């Protein structure tokens, strides 16, 4: 689990194949750090906020993402974590960031799925039969601006604004990032 949290903040996990930590997986780039984070997570009674706070207050996380030619020559893939990574956000986080920076993000937690704005007709023809056609009940008011975590998903298709979303047919722990 801590590998996934690391991946969330650094773009790549301490074990590159975040969905597979078995014997056939990639080796950890920093095995001692991974073990220490896992032990800390356990010792803190699986407190996610504690681990996330630990990561974002670390000197490694707080480094600049500017890379000089000399550093790039020594460590081109940043395996040594000598600078902060640059990576694109997955679409749900991108939407949330846009809402937060505009002051529109509704911070309400929990509750039923919400139906934020979707272009008209985007769900047309996605049902197996006409009798099962789906009418998208677009939310009103503050529910339009809830976090993407609460956005309604059909089993067969992701919301239109979640571009490059993985299929719901299989479990995916590493979101694809749009270039």
What positions do the PLM features span?
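Primarily short, surface-exposed interaction patches in extracytoplasmic proteins
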Residues: 1-145, 156, 160-179
């Amino acid at each position: 689990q801590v590998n996934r949290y690391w991946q969330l903040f650094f773009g790549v996990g301490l074990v590159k194949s975040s969905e597979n930590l078995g014997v056939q997986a990639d080796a950890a780039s920093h095995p001692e750090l991974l073990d220490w984070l896992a032990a800390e997570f356990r010792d803190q009674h699986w407190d996610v906020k504690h681990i996330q706070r630990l990561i974002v207050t670390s000197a490694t996380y707080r480094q600049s993402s500017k890379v000089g030619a000399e550093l790039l020559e020594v460590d081109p893939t940043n395996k040594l974590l000598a600078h902060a990574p640059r990576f694109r956000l997955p679409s749900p986080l991108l939407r949330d960031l846009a809402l937060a920076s505009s002051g529109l993000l509704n911070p309400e937690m929990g509750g039923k799925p919400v139906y934020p704005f979707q272009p008209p007709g985007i769900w047309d023809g996605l049902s197996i039969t006409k009798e099962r056609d789906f009418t998208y009940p677009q939310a009103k008011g503050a529910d339009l601006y809830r976090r993407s975590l609460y956005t309604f998903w059909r089993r067969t298709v992701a919301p239109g604004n979640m571009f490059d979303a993985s299929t719901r047919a299989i479990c995916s722990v590493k979101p694809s990032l749009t270039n």
